A protein has these predicted regions:
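ABC ATPase NBD Q-loop/coupling interface
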Residues: 92-107
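A short, flexible loop at the N-terminus of ABC-type nucleotide-binding domains that lies
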Residues: 23-32, 37-49, 81-86, 102-104
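Conserved ABC ATPase signature
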Residues: 166-170, 174
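Conserved catalytic motifs of ABC-family nucleotide-binding domains
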Residues: 187
Length: 211
């Protein structure tokens, strides 16, 4: 074995050990262990013996062809499974150490914020400001605190000059930022993106990823 190859192997080994050390220092947030799910209307599982652990601070991309189970994993994480989409599960699935399959949609929304592929499917308010404030209104946050929080989050995603606009007046990139603000407003633990760049041009996509 050449000296260069030995160095490469040592570097790889050290990087793996460092990653394992960092994992031990952080807490797992999402844990799938031998997890399987089969929709009621299907004859075989969409997810079969999935093992996946995501730790605090990690950014994970799930990639695969159509029908490979990407959306099913997302539905498990945001609570649509088993609350909306029914089926049979086996194995364990935890969020922040708790059995995630026992959470209702409201409980799950306290931990997970979802940004959909098509922002138009997610808008609720008549204006950008109302849409960002929607979750705070449901939590009965005092009005002044709500106004300050909406302004702060809108500045973070660079839509603070559009708070009085209708969401449907915005460009694709601006719409995506508004939906992101709507989930950031509650200081949630997990951000879940369902193909957030699918409808964006390269420049808008890069800006969204930076946020």
């Amino acid at each position: 074995m050449s000296f260069i190859n030995e160095i490469k192997l040592i570097l790889v080994h050290l990087m793996i050990k460092e990653r394992e050390r960092m994992k031990r220092m952080r807490k797992p947030v999402i844990e799938f262990e031998n997890f399987s799910f089969q929709y009621r209307v299907q004859s075989s599982p969409t997810l079969k013996n999935i093992n996946l652990t995501i730790y605090e601070g990690e950014k994970v991309v799930i990639v695969g062809p159509s029908g490979s189970g990407k959306s099913t994993i997302a539905h498990c994480i945001n609570g649509l499974i088993p609350n909306i989409y029914k089926g049979t599960t086996s194995g364990t699935f935890k969020i922040k150490g708790q059995n995630a399959l026992k959470h209702n949609i409201f409980e799950r929304s306290a931990h997970v914020g979802t940004v959909l592929q098509n922002p138009d499917d997610q808008f609720i308010g008549l204006t950008v400001g109302e849409d960002i404030a929607f979750k705070l209104e449901n939590l009965v946050v005092p009005q002044q605190e709500m106004i300050e929080t909406v302004q702060k989050v809108a500045q973070l995603v660079n839509v603070d000059s559009h708070l009085t606009y209708s969401p449907h007046q915005l460009s694709g990139g601006q719409k995506q930022r508004v939906t992101l603000a709507g989930v950031l407003v509650d200081d949630i633990d997990i951000l879940l993106f369902d193909e957030p760049l699918a409808n964006l041009d390269p420049a808008a996509g890069l800006h969204t990823m930076t946020l």
